């Protein structure tokens, strides 16, 4: 696990994506380890092309008018694919356009190994999107990455992970409640506690029994700690 925090083993990621959809995807992968004895997850970056038509649509959506390139005879060029991505830092580190995951699970309860592959745009993802929306055939992902995953695996002896397990991510509201509950429970002082409580109100979670209960409990603990400190 420590290797995942090495700078040589990470890529630049959209902040909203990292804190929301990708985070919920990783939580789903961790939950798989509670269901199956052997879970293997491979993640990585992708730089995928867009058709000229796609770029024109995207530019127009942003209010920018972009005309197709023209030939010398006045006819428009045939659309072609290009890869476009930003770079960051003084070393101009390339920011991937997409991220991928290959998730495989094995267990005695399964007739065959189960596996699914996903390609997720490195950008904010709509709250109504599901993980299955980004599922792709493993062969398609391999053609884009240039690698063959689980090369010794008999592809005919594998079932689809999402068909067996559902690939259901935690709902966005439950996701927010999870982190706010944890933040309130571990708040180190009243200021930190109140900050999480304001978040609970903002997401309309302050009336949830578990959130309210842990807030009142932690508030009493911090109040007692303050009183004990003042008495010494």
Each model region followed by its residue ranges:
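Domain-level detector of nuclease and nuclease-like folds
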Residues: 1-196, 202, 226-232
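Repeat-associated, polar segments at repeat-unit boundaries in modular proteins
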Residues: 200-232
């Amino acid at each position: 696990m420590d290797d995942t925090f090495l700078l040589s083993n990470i890529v630049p990621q959209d902040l909203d994506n990292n804190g929301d959809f990708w985070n919920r995807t990783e939580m789903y992968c961790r939950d798989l380890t509670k269901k199956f004895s052997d879970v293997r997850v491979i993640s990585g970056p992708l730089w995928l092309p867009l058709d000229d038509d796609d770029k024109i649509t995207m530019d127009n959506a942003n209010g920018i008018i972009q005309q197709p390139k023209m030939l010398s005879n006045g006819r428009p060029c045939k659309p072609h694919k290009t890869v476009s991505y930003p770079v960051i830092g003084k070393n101009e580190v390339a920011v991937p356009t997409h991220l991928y995951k290959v998730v495989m699970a094995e267990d005695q309860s399964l007739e065959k190994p189960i596996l699914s592959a996903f390609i997720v745009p490195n950008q904010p993802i709509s709250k109504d999107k599901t993980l299955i929306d980004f599922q792709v055939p493993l062969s398609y992902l391999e053609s884009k990455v240039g690698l063959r995953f689980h090369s010794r695996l008999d592809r005919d002896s594998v079932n689809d992970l999402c068909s067996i397990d559902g690939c259901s991510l935690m709902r966005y509201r439950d996701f927010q409640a999870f982190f706010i509950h944890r933040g309130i429970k571990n708040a180190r002082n009243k200021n930190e506690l109140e900050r999480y409580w304001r978040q609970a109100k903002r997401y309309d979670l302050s009336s949830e029994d578990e959130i309210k209960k842990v807030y009142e409990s932690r508030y009493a603990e911090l109040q007692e700690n303050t009183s004990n400190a003042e008495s010494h």
